[in-house]
């Protein structure tokens, strides 16, 4: 379409290795005959002859040609072709069609993920950001949204073509098994969830923060910050935690997780003047912890803190947020 003029091809090797490399046996043939009888009522002699000849051969006589996985290809070009390699086995091509066409899913996810990478790369350049952070600026929390373990592995692996950040363990396993991927395949950080924060009680949220910081004294740690009241945490809560955050050898990443992401992060113009809601997360944290100035004159938050937003995100919304950040004089590297 007008927006996606090319596709990033990915996923073929998984289907070839998982489904088409196993030797074809008599057991496979009998299973096929059984399903044929169930669905169509009988197995014609010509079908039985074809399948028996395939069992005798023992493998799929097919040649699959494809562009290199990970390649971006202009739309309306062939991504792969399948032909038979032995006379009389022309019909095998049609038998694997449905299986191999499932690369539409992995290719679609890889393409979408690549568009996000290109978006963050462009805004990083425009705002003087940190290129080394880009592989972590789009993080895969999609495991729970997938319909199966296989879907999670394949979709998550497609994301890893472009980024390193993931919480989808099956994707890391699949990348190693089917693509011989070398470390680092996918990375993440210690992070809290709402149940953890609730376990300290309504008035124990600061204690929950301190507990997370104590258990993770170094490196990056992400803490969900809207369990009760995001704005309380970012104002009075941060005042209580400020010295501990600054003294820590690492970065505390605040995670808002509800509301309109654009307004939460960049400020709600409808909120009362001077209110935390009007300022938004970035401006509050900039005032509390200070900023550095990038080569383009944009503001980059103190390296001791960061912001991640993982709810209700999609390309157009992310694009709007990055544009608003630019208009506010904020560097794109402030956001994961």
Residue ranges and their predicted role:
Residues 67, 307-315:
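Glycine-rich beta-to-alpha transition loops that act as phosphate-gripper elements at the mouths
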Residues 52-61, 70-74, 79-295, 314-317:
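Buried, small/hydrophobic-residue-enriched core segments of structured protein domains
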Residues 1-43:
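Low-complexity, highly charged intrinsically disordered N-terminal segments
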Residues 313-327:
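Catalytic cores of alpha/beta
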Residues 303, 309-311, 332:
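Active-site-proximal binding-pocket segments
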């Amino acid at each position: 379409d007008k927006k996606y003029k090319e596709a990033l091809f990915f996923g073929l090797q998984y289907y070839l290795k998982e489904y088409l490399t196993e030797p074809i046996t008599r057991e496979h043939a009998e299973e096929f005959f059984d399903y044929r009888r169930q669905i169509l009522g009988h197995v014609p002699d010509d079908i039985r002859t074809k399948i028996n000849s395939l069992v005798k051969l023992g493998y799929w006589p097919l040649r699959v040609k494809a562009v290199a996985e990970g390649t971006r290809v202009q739309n309306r070009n062939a991504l792969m072709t399948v032909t038979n390699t032995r006379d009389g086995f022309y019909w095998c091509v049609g038998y694997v069609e449905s299986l191999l066409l499932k690369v539409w899913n992995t290719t679609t996810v890889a393409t979408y993920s690549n568009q996000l990478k290109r978006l963050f790369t462009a805004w990083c350049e425009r705002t003087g950001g940190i290129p080394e952070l880009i592989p972590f600026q789009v993080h895969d929390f999609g495991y729970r949204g997938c319909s199966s373990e296989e879907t999670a592995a394949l979709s998550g692996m497609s994301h890893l073509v472009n980024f390193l950040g993931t919480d989808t363990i099956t994707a890391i396993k699949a990348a190693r098994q089917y693509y011989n991927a070398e470390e680092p395949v996918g990375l993440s950080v210690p992070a809290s969830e709402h149940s953890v924060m609730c376990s300290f009680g309504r008035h124990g949220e600061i204690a929950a923060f301190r507990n997370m910081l104590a258990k993770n004294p170094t490196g990056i740690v992400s803490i969900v910050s809207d369990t009760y009241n995001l704005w309380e945490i970012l104002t009075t809560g941060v005042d209580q935690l400020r010295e501990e955050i600054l003294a820590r050898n690492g970065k505390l990443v605040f995670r808002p997780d509800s509301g309109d992401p654009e307004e939460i992060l960049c400020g709600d113009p409808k909120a009362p003047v001077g209110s935390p809601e009007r300022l938004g997360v970035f401006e509050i944290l900039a005032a509390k912890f200070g900023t550095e100035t990038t080569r383009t004159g944009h503001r980059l938050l103190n390296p001791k803190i960061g912001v991640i937003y993982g709810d209700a995100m999609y390309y157009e919304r992310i694009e709007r947020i990055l544009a608003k950040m630019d208009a506010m004089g904020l560097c794109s590297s402030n956001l994961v």
